[in-house]
Design a protein with these regions (language model features):
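Surface-exposed patches in structured soluble domains
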Residues: 1, 17-22, 28-34, 98, ...
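N-terminal beta-strand block that forms a small beta-sandwich/beta-barrel module immediately after a flexible targeting
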Residues: 1-15, 173, 222
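A generic structural motif
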Residues: 3-6, 22, 39, 116, ...
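Alpha-helical coiled-coil segments
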Residues: 24, 42-97, 115-118, 140, ...
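Residues that recognize and position ribonucleotide moieties
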Residues: 36, 142, 217-218, 235
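Short hydrophobic/aromatic beta-strand micro-patches
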Residues: 37, 143, 189-191
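Short, compositionally biased
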Residues: 45-58, 144-150, 172-180, 219-228
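Structural microfeature recognizing short secondary-structure transition sites
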Residues: 113-114, 138, 162, 166-233
Length: 240
């Protein structure tokens, strides 16, 4: 069965009201494209205020350093001015980050699978904006019998035939370490390119895994015989 290489719920990191939803369900997006845009509200003003306080703290710290050269400031005053400057710098970074987080963007190229919110909804930190699905490459998941598990390894090339579609090729990217207890088969994943996104998630597919070659002889069934114990043998003629 085919499934996405990644399926991620993209969540809000701050609280805010949705103003725009460019990441519509079914849309293909690139990494960095906007999925949800939250209202800026007072965040621009917060950034402007924090930048002004930083500039003030910087000038005060510079003034304290100038006076210290004339031995008119104590070490305590210098340390306090520096601490206030670093606090102001951190507040600027915090305000910039809060403003940037109003834009919820795609972490990778993919397809918007679900969009459980609407314009006007208020998101809290952790609320899902969209579910994003990566389908290039796409994964093919299946099972390998216990008797064949030693014949395959990660990196082996595999062919696959879609029930209603073309043949595809891929590479084994994962083999489970433990079998399914009921079937005694091991889970396996095959990664296959899907640049045109022609292979959808959830499709049934038949996989062909090449095994190691073994030399053998083809013997006609007419040459096979059973002994009195029921064992299969081959009747041969010794011309010596």
């Amino acid at each position: 069965v085919t499934r996405p290489n990644r399926l991620v719920n993209v969540r809000a990191e701050i609280q805010g009201r949705i103003e725009h939803l460019p990441g519509e369900k079914g849309r293909r997006v690139k990494a960095g494209d906007e999925l949800c845009v939250l209202a800026v509200d007072s965040r621009h003003a917060d950034l402007t205020q924090s930048q002004a306080l930083f500039n003030k703290a910087f000038l005060e710290y510079k003034g304290v350093l100038d006076l210290s050269k004339q031995r008119l400031q104590s070490e305590i005053n210098i340390a306090q001015a520096k601490a206030e400057l670093e606090t102001a710098r951190a507040n600027v970074k915090r305000a910039e980050l809060a403003l940037a987080k109003t834009r919820i963007v795609a972490p990778f190229d993919g397809v918007v699978d679900k969009q459980p919110v609407e314009v006007g909804d208020v998101l809290s930190p952790g609320t899902v904006c969209v579910s994003l699905m990566e389908t290039n490459p796409i994964l093919i998941t299946g099972q390998i019998a216990e008797k064949n598990i030693s014949a395959v390894k990660p990196g082996d090339r595999v062919r696959g035939k879609l029930v209603h579609g073309p043949e595809v090729t891929g590479t084994i990217s994962f083999i489970g370490s433990a079998p399914e207890m009921q079937t005694r088969t091991y889970p396996v994943e095959v990664t296959t390119p899907n640049p045109k996104n022609l292979i959808r998630s959830g499709l049934s597919i038949e996989m062909f895994v090449p095994m190691a070659q073994t030399r053998a002889h083809l013997i006609s069934s007419a040459s096979l015989v059973l002994n009195d114990a029921g064992d299969v043998g081959v009747r041969v003629v010794d011309n010596a």
